[in-house]
């Protein structure tokens, strides 16, 4: 399998829906992929980044459960915060045999339904989820690989604030 990496430059200062289609070089390839990116703001905004970390925590399991397990959209289903340069975003990535337009629609439907679920969450459940995230952030790294991965992620993002984790705990 040959993976191709490419970069697309889009001005995210204006709102919009941007789709970039790529023709596969192998016409027999049944899989497609969707990288659904939501631009959130400037990653230097500590409060915004902290809130997005909570959203990421709230969405991770339901995204996999709904889109991978229940809808069986694809083998690869991931959701995550996304840091690049100064941009802060949220990504849902799905590799699927289904048409990308269909996958995109299912992602949007899921986000709308889960938005309502978060809005209707009672305060006790919200506090429980928040505590779960705080506990997760307080966990010590288990090995050198985890620590290297964390540092490397800061380097790749172009935002060299290696104290983010401690800052998150300050904003709790």
Segments (PLM) and residue ranges:
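Mature, solvent-exposed C-terminal subdomains and processed small-chain segments of exported/organellar
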Residues: 1-91, 95-172
């Amino acid at each position: 399998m040959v993976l191709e990496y490419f970069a697309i430059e889009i001005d995210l200062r204006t709102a919009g829906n941007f789709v970039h289609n790529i023709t596969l070089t192998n016409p027999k390839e049944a899989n497609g992929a969707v990288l659904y990116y939501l631009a959130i703001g400037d990653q230097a905004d500590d409060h915004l980044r902290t809130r997005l970390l909570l959203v990421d925590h709230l969405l991770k399991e339901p995204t996999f459960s709904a889109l991978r397990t229940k809808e069986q959209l694809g083998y690869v289903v991931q959701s995550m915060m996304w840091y690049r340069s100064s941009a802060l975003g949220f990504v849902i990535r799905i590799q699927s045999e289904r048409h990308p337009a269909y996958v995109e629609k299912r992602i949007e439907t899921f986000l709308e339904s889960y938005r309502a679920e978060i809005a209707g969450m009672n305060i006790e459940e919200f506090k429980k989820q928040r505590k779960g995230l705080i506990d997760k952030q307080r966990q010590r790294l288990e090995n050198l690989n985890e620590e290297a991965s964390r540092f490397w992620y800061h380097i790749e993002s172009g935002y060299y604030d290696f104290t983010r984790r401690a800052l998150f705990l300050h904003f709790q």
